[in-house]
Amino acid sequence: MSPGNKVATVSAADVRSAISRQLKPHWTAPQGADAEKLVTIIAFTLNSDGTLAGTPELYAQSGVTDANRPQAQRHVELAIRAVKLAAPFKLPADVYSHFHKFTAKFDRQLSQ
């Protein structure tokens, strides 16, 4: 198998799963009214050694209600913190030749 074909065995779903497993220990969803409805997606770029290339940032957020609006910004802050704490990410080296930019979904389910 040539090096170019090796990445074909590592799917995007596998990469997302590996990243989620590494984020989970660093993520605690904020508490409060309707906080379980919040979903925050953070975008970040990784160097070939798994370290962060730049600062993670908010990509999207959903589930914001009048009741959980006070927790929404905290949700983003905690998600960015989790990405920073999880770095450097441990992914197969060949992944970095095909994937540099990542997104991660933070919700109540990830903290369980």
For the regions a protein language model found, what residue spans apply to each?
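Short beta-strand
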Residues: 32-35, 94-96
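Short, conserved micro-motifs enriched in small and acidic residues
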Residues: 13, 73-74
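An anionic, turn-rich surface loop/hairpin at beta-sheet edges
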Residues: 66-73
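Short, small/polar residue-rich loop motifs at catalytic or cofactor-binding pockets
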Residues: 38-40
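Conserved "boundary/linchpin" sites in short secondary-structure elements
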Residues: 3, 21-27, 45-65, 77-112
